[in-house]
């Protein structure tokens, strides 16, 4: 069966992904274009370990062209009617929801996540467009008196300019809408470089933006298989005034250094190593349920996944039983198959890291109570959901983000001890704590050195909540009423009486 035939059995509208014919194209200046070189790269289906379809592989020069086009479009779009921005974003939201099934199916094909997870992400992604449509109408400044009685001060907010957006593969829809929704609402134009692993979901969002009436040049998308070269262009081109990146801390540091040459405004949402603390007075059933969503969602491939699970020694054994019981009920398999709860990891590199963390834990005294190996009967990218007990500080899993379906449970005895362990990390994105003591919830919640804390919940991501970290997890906030501010400059006008 040909590639297009395989796709058409799962996807209703191949045109949504620019797959009526191959390769899929990039979107620059309101036109769908292929690389002048004719180069393409293949996108893989990790669930079947086979090629999904080819995509055009654009050059750095073509990214440079997209930046110029975006700059030209910005000169008019920055002055666009905010009510028109609202209307366009609302149409985009409606189109995303109308095409949710195809978007989720493609996400499963190229990312591997179970279809239920993919459908949840599409809805989550659409909500950011809906939210920022409203935020376009709420951009406001203020006025004030001056220390000089003859002067008045007026403060206004203006779009920063062209924004370079670099997105990851683990949330191929939501990471685009969370950034682009805010940028377009603010009056900025964008050049997007989606992850090479998951370009089709991104291209579909560009198609729907075009259908919604986003003006030519306002949203541009460049697909490429050489991220570092295109990243250099986005971070050093003087026409780009802001870069927004979600990805690893190491890459974020490189982009920040490159951006310093032109002092660009930056939003960096980087890696985490989230502590998940279960105190002796916690509702253990609720905490175990929360851990399933927090640790194993997307097969553990999210930046806010619990990575270090600290359980008070008095409830440790009981909590291990609850967690093991739940994990053993997961169904690992191909994301489009009925009943599957967890899919494959994205690549062999991801598999290797998870194996390394499990092997290191076992060598240092950890015990695997369920899972712990590649499910080779399903394919090379499938790793069994795993629970490790007797975990200790000093294991790799306590020091590095695993980014896989491995839950390691550590014992602790005192609040001071566990807070110190939780904060003993160079990163600080998310943290979680479970306790019925409201004083402890506030005390520990404020003590954790992270940007987001889930208190008696395993879910911290919400359209209305500011998303972002501290320390080496980056800076800037996305979503919420604060998200649009990342794309606005504040200008003061001091006016004297004549």
Swiss-Prot record:
The active site is at residues 269, 303. It holds the Pfam family Aldedh. One of its GO terms (molecular function) is succinate-semialdehyde dehydrogenase (NAD+) activity. Catalyzes the oxidation of succinate semialdehyde to succinate. Can utilize both NAD(+) or NADP(+) as a coenzyme. Functions in a gamma-aminobutyrate (GABA) degradation pathway that allows growth utilizing GABA as a nitrogen source. Functions in the GABA shunt, which allows to bypass 2 reactions in the TCA cycle by removing alpha-ketoglutarate from the cycle and feeding succinate and NADH back into the cycle. One of its GO terms (biological process) is gamma-aminobutyric acid catabolic process. It is found in: Cytoplasm. Belongs to the aldehyde dehydrogenase family. Keywords: Cytoplasm, NADP, Oxidoreductase. It comes from Schizosaccharomyces pombe (strain 972 / ATCC 24843) (Fission yeast). GO terms for cellular component: cytosol; mitochondrion. Its main location: cytoplasm. This is Succinate-semialdehyde dehydrogenase [NADP(+)] 1. NAD(+) binds at residues 247-252. The gene is ssd1. InterPro entries: Ald_DH/histidinol_DH, Ald_DH_C, Ald_DH_CS_GLU, Ald_DH_N, Aldehyde_DH_dom, Aldehyde_DH_Superfamily, Succ_semiAld_DH. It catalyses: succinate semialdehyde + NAD(+) + H2O = succinate + NADH + 2 H(+); succinate semialdehyde + NADP(+) + H2O = succinate + NADPH + 2 H(+). Its EC number is 1.2.1.16. Homotetramer. Pathway: Amino-acid degradation; 4-aminobutanoate degradation.
């Amino acid at each position: 069966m040909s590639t297009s035939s395989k796709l058409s059995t799962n996807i209703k509208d191949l045109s949504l992904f620019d797959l009526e014919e191959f390769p899929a194209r990039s979107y620059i200046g309101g036109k769908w274009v292929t690389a002048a070189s004719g180069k393409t790269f293949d996108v893989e289906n990790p669930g079947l370990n086979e090629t999904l379809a080819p995509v055009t592989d654009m050059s750095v020069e073509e990214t440079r062209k997209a930046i110029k086009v975006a700059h030209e479009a910005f000169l008019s779009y920055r002055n666009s009617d905010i009510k028109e921005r609202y209307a366009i974003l609302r149409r985009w939201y409606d189109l995303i929801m109308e095409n949710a099934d195809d978007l989720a199916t493609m996400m499963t094909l190229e990312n591997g996540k179970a279809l239920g997870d993919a459908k949840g992400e599409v809805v989550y992604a659409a909500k950011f467009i809906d939210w920022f449509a409203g935020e376009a109408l709420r951009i406001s400044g203020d006025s004030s008196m001056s220390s000089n009685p003859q002067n008045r001060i007026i403060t206004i907010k203006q779009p920063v300019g062209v924004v370079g957006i670099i997105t990851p593969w683990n949330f191929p829809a939501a990471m685009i809408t969370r950034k682009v929704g805010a940028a377009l609402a603010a009056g900025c134009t964008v050049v997007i470089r989606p992850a090479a692993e998951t370009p089709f979901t991104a291209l579909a969002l560009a198609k729907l933006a075009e259908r919604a009436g986003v003006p030519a040049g306002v949203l541009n998308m460049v697909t490429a298989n050489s991220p570092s070269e295109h990243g250099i262009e986005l971070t050093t081109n003087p026409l780009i005034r802001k870069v927004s990146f979600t990805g690893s801390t190491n890459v974020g540091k490189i982009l920040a250094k490159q951006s310093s040459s032109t002092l660009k405004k930056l939003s960096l949402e980087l890696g985490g190593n989230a502590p998940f603390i279960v105190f002796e007075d916690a509702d253990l059933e609720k905490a175990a349920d929360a851990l399933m969503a927090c640790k194993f969602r997307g097969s553990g491939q999210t930046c806010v996944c619990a990575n270090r699970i600290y359980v008070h020694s008095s409830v440790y054994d009981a909590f291990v039983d609850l967690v093991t019981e739940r994990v053993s009920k997961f169904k690992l398999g191909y994301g489009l198959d009925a009943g599957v709860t967890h899919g494959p990891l994205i690549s062999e590199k991801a598999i290797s890291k998870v194996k390394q963390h499990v092997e290191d834990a076992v060598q240092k005294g950890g015990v695997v109570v369920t899972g712990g190996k590649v499910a080779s009967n399903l394919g090379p990218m499938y790793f069994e959901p795993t629970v490790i007990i007797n975990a200790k500080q000093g294991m790799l899993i306590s020091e590095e983000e695993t980014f896989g379906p491995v839950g390691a449970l550590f014992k602790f005895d005192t609040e001071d001890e566990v807070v110190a362990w939780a904060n003993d990390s160079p990163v600080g994105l998310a943290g979680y704590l479970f306790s019925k003591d409201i004083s402890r919830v506030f005390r520990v919640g404020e003590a954790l050195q992270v940007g987001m804390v889930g208190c008696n919940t395993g879910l911290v991501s919400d359209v209305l909540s500011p998303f972002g970290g501290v320390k080496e997890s980056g800076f800037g906030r996305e979503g919420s009423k604060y998200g649009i501010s990342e794309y606005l400059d504040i200008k003061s006008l001091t006016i004297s009486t004549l």
